[in-house]
Amino acid sequence: MPTEPTAAPPRPPLDWPTLGRIVLKALLLFTLLNAAFAAARPLEALGRLSLYNGLLPGRARLPYGEVPANDYNLTLNNLPAMFAAHELARPKAADEFRVLLIGDSGTWGWFLRHEATLAGQLNDLGLRAADGRRVVVYNLGYPVLSLTKDLLLLDTALSDDADLILWPVTLHSLARGRQFDHPLLQQNADHVRDLIARYNLALDPFDSRLVVRTRLDETLVARRRDLADLLRLQALALAWAATGIDQAIPADIPLRQSDLDADESWLDIAGPRPLTDDDLTFDVLRAGVARAGGVPVVVINEPIFISDGANSNVRYNSFYPRWAYDQYRERLARAAAAEGWRYVDLWDAIPPDEFTDTPVHLTPAGARLLAEKLVEVLEPDIIQIRN
């Protein structure tokens, strides 16, 4: 008669000491993992690992997106990840004349498809350098009005072989008190402080907006959002490759203000007075040209919307009262002459109808016209580019 298999003895109930040891080991492992993460600070190294420019094409402009699900893009503050995702990271071709285009949201191309931006329009012109190389323009604009942001991006980008730098600027970009307003600068505080020290900039390295991280701020728990952003950027690479979309553009774009208030203030300056170096960051502009070294830099006073509506005798647009902008133009021209900069003033080069929602954002036709005008003034005296 077959015998029934002996039943396994019942497991003893989980007693409190055993449970305590399990929890203690888990806490110890969790603590060690966070301590190792804080000590290694791996986010920048992880940012350099990218699907872009390898398995999938690089982006035509730096990552920036307010609604990732619609933009197939997102905003993050990891500079290595931003540049690893950009097409600038691909190897430079032997016949390539590499042009870096830096600047604000107008350069980045707000409400423009990437091929309709200034960089895209310049590339569409099929330009050649004097030595016959193909002119390839890389869009390194970023939607922040800050010359310090431009310097930060330029300092990062110049590890790649550049032949020319185009640098559109506007008065708001020089406002000293607003240089650190964006998280890109705040979260890259060590890099910003290094630039301040390296170029003796009249900016406060201890500004409260610049983040100071303790060891606890560098743990995996504290930086989990930044780590998730790296993963999200890689996840969006397939959508970018499949669609070429990196910004959701509404069907109806709101137009800039034409009828203006009778208000002579500029930012926190209540009314007309001389603008000084305490107001304007010409030192940061000098630092950018110095950082370029032997790479030629063309400083461009970018076009602005000029209103003919109510109170247009007081203000050019919603950004700028006439007194402040006129002083800025005069001071920029004087600084360029004194420093020997290559300088182009295109402030009134674009008709008012070719601006969209702000005084510095262009339509596709406006960006095309700007590209053509820029080529006209650069050829042949400055860089000798030709079709």
Would you name each region that the model predicts?
Residues 1-18:
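N-terminal Lys/Arg-rich, disordered targeting/topogenic segments
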Residues 21-39:
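Hydrophobic membrane-insertion alpha-helices, especially the h-region
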Residues 42-132, 353-354:
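Membrane/wall-proximal cationic-aromatic binding patches
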Residues 97, 133-135, 160-165, 293-297, ...:
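Loop/turn elements at helix/coil->beta-strand transitions in domains of secreted/extracellular proteins
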Residues 108-193:
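Conserved SGNH/GDSL esterase-like catalytic core that processes O-acyl groups on lipids
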Residues 139-141, 301-303, 345-348:
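Residue-level recognition of beta-strand->loop/alpha-helix junctions
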Residues 175-330, 351-352:
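Serine-dependent acyl-ester chemistry module
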Residues 306-387:
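Catalytic His-Asp segment of secreted/periplasmic serine-dependent ester chemistry enzymes
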